[in-house]
Amino acid sequence: MKEFLKKKFEQLTGSKLYRNSLPRGTCLIHDIKRLSHAPIKEVWDVGAHQGETALYFAKKFPKSTIRSFEPVSSNYNLLIQNCRKLENFHAHNFALGEQNTKTKIFFQGASVIHSLRDDLNKPSTEDTKSEDIKVKTIDYVLNEFETTTTDLLKIDVEGYEIQVLGGARKSLTEKKINFIYLETGLDDRFNSIQSLNDFLKPIGYLPYAFYEQTAHWTGTQNLWYWNTLFVKEELL
């Protein structure tokens, strides 16, 4: 009887009912909770911008510690302001990359598209503004924070993802990170899914699903970019 009613409901509404589990790729949080062997205790938000993702993860994982990394001072100040009411929240005013260093970041129009990638991080005009920032590696910061693991590492750094992962090679090899959620795309501005897989697969991280698929801004409706969840193979 229950199965009959389920089918009738689906026929009448055009909806699909799932009893215990959604299909992979439907909901990031659902997939992480399904795969994780323990509660999510630590989330790192790399390329935090003004706190949008930190607020989202704090709501979905209310008992976790959120660490946000944002090097640009104007974004960082708004990050602090927007997340001031969050418990267990820590903001860090530096970038994460392949080595510990200091560098200059050039501002590229909208604040969400600043990038440290060499071919993107350059002045577009004589009046292009810039800021001196610090860069640290994930391996260094994990040791500095005396943190043994990071459950979820989110990276949105406008094409600089491989460099961030390059600074986490030791931590990744030692499986100190469980989930990696990062932006991928089809044009040169984004890291390709193939390049990320080539980096992560040999050290034991495999792609699990795609999320937030976005069409090209020109309105042609072809796929432009999306987010990919990589999972350490022991959890699969």
Segments predicted by a language model, with ranges:
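Phosphate/nucleotide-binding beta-alpha loop and adjacent structural elements of enzyme active sites
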Residues: 1-236
